[in-house]
């Protein structure tokens, strides 16, 4: 099988995009997982594109390397896709003309996901509407948990851990560097998470509220599967989950000039290597609804690149 691909990243979250029309029926998952493997394109997620249906511009299926299955959402993929559609010929491949001001409607398993293209000249950026994923979180529920003796939150399918909980349990650990003791602790908590939560998946976020640069709110990293060395320096869905957990835990407050119902704009330090935080910024906007729930969610990332384009040959 010979398939065209384009690869990129969002702050180190590596993404490969494939043309689904080139994949044999019934082998989409198998081939995508092979492409994600270190022997081929070494990526965290794959996006399989098809022409749009039911009013959407594109239909998107998503494969996660950590979970080894189709998944409902991937924010990093939508950010890379925005860059791909504005800087390569893949927009024309699907008969799309994408420019500043365009809104591209993606048909995903989570529902219609709009991405808005903005910028000046050739410098494009993408804002992803994550409201459908936010709804998935609330549908699956949010709850505090005690795992391996430490507090955490289940936010939908995500396990969200505040790094201070690792510091309390491991006084000698440098948790922000994900040292050996911190990794063992995270693995133990995740193993208990799998036992206790039917919603559990390979979706894990570590954060704290000790940013190193003024104007930022949180630091994040996403060690989805430490035993498999699958650690994402940035993650769109994980960033939304972190903000929901931080609100629930009281580390963030909804505030603004419009009062309690003002949109909450947050900056998360991310990207770079396998440390908590990083040189990039993930921007999250949450719009409050009724009660204590958020009604809408949006995000963008400061560092999105297309890294290569070509063809892959697989057996």
Name what the model sees in each region.
Residues 1-139, 149-315:
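A glycine-rich beta-to-alpha transition motif near the start of alpha/beta enzyme domains, typified by
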